[in-house]
A protein has these predicted regions:
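Glycine-rich phosphate/adenosyl-contacting loop at the front of the ribokinase-like
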Residues: 1-61, 66-77
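Ribokinase/PfkB-type carbohydrate-kinase core domain
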Residues: 1-11, 73-87, 100-158
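Generic hydrophobic-segment detector
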Residues: 15, 29-36, 94, 103, ...
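Short, basic and Ser/Thr-rich N-terminal targeting/leader segments
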Residues: 52, 91-94
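Beta-strand->loop->alpha-helix junctions that form or flank phosphate-binding loops
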Residues: 59-64, 83-92
């Protein structure tokens, strides 16, 4: 089986459906569903590839917090190798709250968190070098990795 390294933006999404309005003050609104997912252009892609039967190795960053535990737990349940995810002490795992509207619109409230800290030093070069395929997702959402760090990583992947 071919190995795919899926590297980049890993986000824990909290989705609420259907949200017509945010109640004022301390009021409550009842909705149909709340769920959490592994999301972002690396984590979400990893889950999809794992569902298709690929051997997936996740490379990115997550906090040493409960959100990071939940995110990696979801990915592990799909058989994704998360052993190369860097746990960043004292930095919140990247997360998004999505109040999904009845018409399907998805405004987002986002914390960049650990994705803002991901850099070339976090990349397991031997894993990238030996992968059959490398997917990098999340340009412009990883300020330390964008640019030169991405170029260095792609040179390793050759």
């Amino acid at each position: 089986m071919k190995t795919v390294v899926s590297m980049g933006v890993h986000i824990l999404d909290v989705l609420g459906r259907h949200v017509s309005e945010i109640p004022p003050g301390q009021n409550i609104a009842l909705i149909d569903e709340i769920r959490i997912t592994a999301a972002g252009t690396a984590a979400g892609t990893s889950v999809d590839m794992a569902k298709l039967g690929c051997k997936v190795v996740a490379v990115g960053a997550a906090g040493d917090d409960e959100m990071g535990n939940v995110l990696l737990g979801i990915m592990n349940r799909y058989g994704i190798d998360t052993s190369h995810m860097k746990r960043k002490k004292g930095v919140q795992t990247s997360g998004t709250m999505l109040p999904i509207r009845p018409n399907g619109e998805r405004p987002a409230l986002h914390v960049m968190g650990t994705n803002a800290t991901f850099c070339f030093e976090d990349v397991p070069q031997d894993v990238v070098k030996n992968a059959d395929f490398v997917h990098i997702g999340g340009f412009y959402l990883m300020p330390k990795f964008d640019g030169e760090d991405t170029v260095k990583t792609l040179k390793v992947a050759r």
